[in-house]
């Protein structure tokens, strides 16, 4: 019996260049292509949480400031969060299409040059 899907969860510590929205967009776009998956909509990258005071941006929740990015897939989604005050990146790749988590790890390592990490690979809906 084939499972419903696969989740790869990667938490990266001491990662580099985490506040670059364009880099995050290109990272997700390239990752989707490397996994031979198809987008179901537009990639979204949001910088936050931010508020404005006297017309200038100020960070809210200082230790959680970063990017939130989402790539909707025909087969599910890729979600990434960065917390640049802590040099932390967390990535979730969920898809009902089978894929190689090592490819995700290697490309993320190449792009964000992290030092330490934690990872989990979960088979979802085993009795689907």
What is each PLM-predicted segment?
Residues 1-128:
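Polybasic/polar functional segments that serve as interface/processing modules
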């Amino acid at each position: 019996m084939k499972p419903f899907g696969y989740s790869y969860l990667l938490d990266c510590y001491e990662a580099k260049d985490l506040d670059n929205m364009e880099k995050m967009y290109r990272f997700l776009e390239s990752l989707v292509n490397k996994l031979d998956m198809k987008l179901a909509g537009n990639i979204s990258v949001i910088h936050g949480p931010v508020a404005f005071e006297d017309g200038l941006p100020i960070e809210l929740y200082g230790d959680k400031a970063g990017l939130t990015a989402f790539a909707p897939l025909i087969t599910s989604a890729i979600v990434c969060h960065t917390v640049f005050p802590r040099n932390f990146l967390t990535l979730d790749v969920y898809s009902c299409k089978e894929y190689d988590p090592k490819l995700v790890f290697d490309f993320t390592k190449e792009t964000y040059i992290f030092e330490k990490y934690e990872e989990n690979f979960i088979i979802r809906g085993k009795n689907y």
